[in-house]
């Protein structure tokens, strides 16, 4: 019984200490069913992003909304946007390469079959688009 109590206390302490602000790496992806253009942002570093105790990026939907709003302002409306993040750059680069290669492979396969490229992949540089940190509201706790 004491061992179980000790393990539970240790687990709670480690989870509580993990929550808070830390550096995260993220990139964005956008696609639309109405268009054949697919957008990828560069990998970006967010120095003071908030991570809650369940290991989720606080305001993760707001990061996707930032990309959606930027693309809508550029005339690319109705985009479905996804923001992928990780706490290590190597893990994020692996996710980025996997998603990017999947779209390149599909585009090459369909180009050979039909003679026309089904996707146009565009890359957004940090000068064109960069994420801004989402700050936790006063009443909301990330811990």
Describe the role of every protein-language-model region.
Residues 3-15:
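Sec-dependent N-terminal signal peptides
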Residues 4, 32-34, 89, 126:
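Generic structural motif
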Residues 8, 53, 119-121:
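Alpha-helical interaction segments
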Residues 11, 32, 44-45, 68, ...:
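Short linear sequence elements within intrinsically disordered, low-complexity coil regions
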Residues 17-19:
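Boundary at the C-terminal end of the N-terminal hydrophobic targeting segment
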Residues 21-80:
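Short aromatic-glycine-(Arg/Gly/Cys) micro-motifs in beta-strand/loop hairpins
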Residues 78-143:
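Surface-exposed, polar helix/loop patches in the mature regions of secreted/periplasmic/lumenal proteins
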């Amino acid at each position: 019984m004491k061992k179980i109590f000790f393990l539970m206390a240790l687990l709670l302490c480690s989870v509580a200490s993990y929550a808070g602000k830390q550096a995260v790496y993220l990139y964005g992806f956008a696609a639309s069913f109405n268009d054949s253009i697919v957008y990828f942002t560069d990998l970006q570093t967010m120095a003071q992003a908030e991570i809650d105790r369940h290991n989720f990026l606080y305001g993760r939907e707001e990061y996707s909304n930032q990309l959606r709003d930027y693309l809508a302002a550029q005339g690319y409306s109705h985009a479905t946007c996804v923001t992928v993040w990780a706490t290590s750059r190597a893990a994020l680069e692996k996710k980025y390469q996997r998603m990017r290669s999947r779209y390149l492979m599909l585009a090459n396969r369909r180009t050979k079959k039909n003679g026309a490229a089904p996707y146009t992949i565009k890359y957004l540089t940090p000068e064109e688009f960069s994420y801004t940190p989402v700050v936790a509201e006063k009443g909301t706790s990330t811990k």
